[in-house]
């Protein structure tokens, strides 16, 4: 028996309730290795392992990693023999790859029962097993059903549950043996496929990697340990299992002891050494119970390996105890993180599911209300947008902010057009004065010159105003389209109908807005301002136009140029500046008003009314609410994930800890 410190306390043989290479030997069931393996864990072990097994059965592993022990090894490393010794059942054996699917081996110790029970689960199949001899056959059937009858492999799990008073409380994941060369009907890239499957499991930080290595090979060259070191370079979550110590060449036993004592290739969790049934033992029909007794005798009598037994590093019972202890410690360590991950995933999926909404009702009456809700939500988003109250991301700007920026640019364009250099204005006025001044004496303002200049300057602003209209219209159309996508993306016909309305209304209102803008500029060709308004503006210009500023205006001109500028030109300039102030105020405000009215207010209102008109034709409800093919599948997928995680949260909440 093995005590809690892993030492041998007596030499009683282990029970004889084992398989004899597919046959059952029921001669002795009075005491089993499991009786001594988990005595200190009776209240803690099973609940911990059951919790993780139940989460795995729920499919939570599809969403996040669960604590596990994964068993890996090269072909012919003795991996199957180790698992047989732990479980008491024969697993598939033979040449080539015999483990073709990941096998979740759930061992459950029965305290007050003697009856052996087994269950194989895969896909939608669940097979109860009453005799251990049936396990190998059922596992092979499951692998053929999942991976085909050839030599291919699959990532899909097979679950084998063994309940017996003679097994430890333990869950292991057996992975295919590592192969290098395709044999027989195996795919040419079987080596790559196998390593890819193994790496998928051992890469996870939640997995303890159980690496099986024969004693009679150089440990540094084994592929399994090399793969484990790639994903766990510090050896924090790797346990080495040394097998076949009876095949070690004479004189090399000391090297094996050094490896087992963690002196060669260091692993923080260390090494164990076991001697399981070999092929000859199987042919001689040596039972697993007999094999365990022979293993114990082997280590007790071996001059080199006896020390490993004394240190608790040898035999299958000690291995079972260590694995159970490591798994429980690992589960307890990862539970808080697991609980947080499940909570975060639950919240994330809940939020994602909201984007897909609820299922479309089958009842026509309910379908109408469903469509009304959809249209109202869309119209509310449009209202928020045109009122400048829509929700945006941290690094995003509201539509109205973007439009306001365009209006600021428009004001800058006006200033740039009006504020030409004084020298250029004087030259322009001089040209008009020479061309249009008639019989007036110097000092009399030529109104024609003033009128032509101001009309020309205002006319130059018309096309920039129309360009601004097109820019803002495109911005609004994109924003409306984004709202349509956010609300109706899963309903292809409704989304397409909405986009069509957005485009049609845009085309109509953009034409109306452009017509209004051009009409405004036509009216601006009438030079007009209220008398009292103009007089105040002219007075401000004249007060500002001091002698010093006049000097600055003409300082860049030559003496000849200054002498050619007469009093009438100065007078025209003052009138131009005065009128420009009032024209600037009108144009800089009125053009944005036109755009806001047509491209925000009317556009939004017409779109909202157009969407509500869809309710008038009841025959189109089903057509409008026809979902994209992937939408319902995605919603179903998210609901299933949410249900899994919700169940997982409830089970974690009930766990005593």
Swiss-Prot record:
Region (G2 motif): 98-100
PROSITE patterns listed in its UniProt record: G_DYNAMIN_1, G_DYNAMIN_2, GED
Conditions for induction: By type I and type III interferons.
Sequence positions bearing N-acetylmethionine: 1
Places the protein is found: Cytoplasm; Endoplasmic reticulum membrane; Cytoplasm, Perinuclear region
Residue span, Dynamin-type G domain: 63-336
Residues covered by region (G4 motif): 243-246
Cellular component per GO, a single term: endoplasmic reticulum membrane
Domain writeup: The C-terminal GTPase effector domain (GED) is involved in oligomerization and viral target recognition.
Record-given protein name: Interferon-induced GTP-binding protein Mx1
Species this chain originates from: Canis lupus familiaris (Dog)
């Amino acid at each position: 028996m093995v005590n809690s410190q892993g030492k041998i306390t007596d030499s009683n043989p282990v029970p004889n309730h084992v398989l004899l290479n597919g046959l059952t030997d029921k001669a002795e069931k009075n005491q089993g290795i499991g009786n001594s393996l988990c005595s200190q864990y009776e209240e803690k072990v099973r609940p911990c392992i059951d919790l993780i097994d139940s989460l795995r059965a729920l499919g939570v592993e599809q969403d996040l990693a669960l604590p596990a022990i994964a068993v890996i090894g090269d072909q012919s490393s003795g991996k199957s023999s180790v698992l047989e010794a732990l479980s008491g059942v024969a697993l598939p054996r033979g040449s080539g790859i015999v483990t073709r699917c990941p096998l979740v081996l759930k061992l459950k110790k029965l305290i007050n029962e003697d009856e052996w029970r087994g269950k194989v689960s895969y896909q939608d199949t669940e097979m109860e097993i009453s005799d251990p001899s049936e396990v190998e056959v059922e596992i092979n059937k499951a692998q053929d059903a999942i991976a085909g009858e050839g030599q291919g492999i699959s990532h899909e799990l097979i679950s084998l549950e063994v309940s017996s008073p003679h097994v430890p409380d333990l869950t292991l994941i057996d992975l295919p043996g590592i192969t290098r060369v395709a044999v027989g009907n195996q795919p040419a890239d079987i080596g790559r496929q196998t390593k890819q499957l193994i790496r998928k499991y051992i890469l996870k930080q939640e997995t303890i990697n159980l690496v099986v290595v024969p004693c009679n090979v150089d440990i540094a060259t084994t592929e399994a340990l090399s793969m484990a070191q790639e994903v766990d370079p510090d050896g924090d979550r790797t346990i080495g299992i040394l097998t076949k110590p009876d095949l070690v060449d004479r004189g090399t036993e000391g090297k094996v002891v050094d490896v087992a004592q963690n002196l060669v290739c260091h692993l923080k969790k260390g090494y164990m050494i076991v001697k399981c049934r070999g092929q000859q033992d199987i042919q001689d029909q040596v039972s697993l119970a007999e094999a365990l007794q022979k293993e114990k005798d082997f280590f007790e009598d071996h001059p080199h390996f006896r020390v490993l037994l004394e240190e608790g590093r040898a035999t299958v019972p000690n291995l079972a105890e260590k694995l159970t202890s490591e798994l429980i410690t690992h589960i307890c360590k990862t539970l808080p993180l697991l609980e947080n991950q499940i909570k975060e995933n639950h919240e994330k999926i809940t939020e994602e599911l909201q984007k897909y909404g609820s299922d479309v009702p089958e009842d026509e009456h309910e379908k109408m209300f469903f469509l009304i809700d959809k249209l109202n939500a869309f119209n509310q988003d449009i209202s928020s947008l045109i009122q400048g109250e829509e929700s945006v991301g941290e690094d995003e700007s509201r539509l109205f902010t973007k439009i306001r920026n365009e209006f600021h640019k428009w004001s800058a364009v006006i200033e740039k057009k009006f504020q030409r250099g004084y020298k250029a204005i004087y030259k322009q006025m001089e040209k008009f004065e020479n061309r249009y001044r008639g019989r007036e004496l110097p000092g009399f303002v030529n109104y024609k010159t003033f009128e032509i200049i101001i009309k020309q300057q205002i006319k130059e602003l018309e096309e920039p105003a129309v360009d601004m209209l097109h820019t803002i219209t495109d911005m609004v159309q994109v924003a409306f389209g984004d709202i349509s996508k956010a609300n109706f993306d899963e309903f292809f016909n409704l989304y397409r109908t909405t986009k069509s309305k957005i485009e049609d209304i845009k085309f109509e209102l953009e034409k109306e807005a452009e017509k209004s803008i051009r009409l405004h500029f036509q009216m601006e060709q009438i030079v007009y301002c209220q008398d009292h308004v103009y007089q105040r503006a002219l007075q401000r210009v004249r007060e500002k136009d001091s002698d010093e500023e006049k000097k600055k205006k003409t300082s860049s001109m030559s003496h000849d140029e200054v002498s050619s500028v007469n009093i009438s030109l100065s007078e025209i300039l003052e009138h131009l500046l005065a009128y420009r102030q009032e024209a600037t105020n009108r144009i800089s405000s009125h053009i944005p008003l036109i755009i806001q009215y047509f491209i925000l207010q009317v556009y939004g209102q017409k779109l909202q009314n157009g969407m509500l008109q869809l309710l008038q034709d009841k025959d189109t409800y089903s057509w409008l609410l026809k979902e994209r093919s992937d939408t319902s599948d995605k919603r179903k997928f998210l609901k299933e994930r949410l249900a899994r995680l919700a169940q997982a949260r409830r089970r974690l909440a009930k766990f005593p800890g």
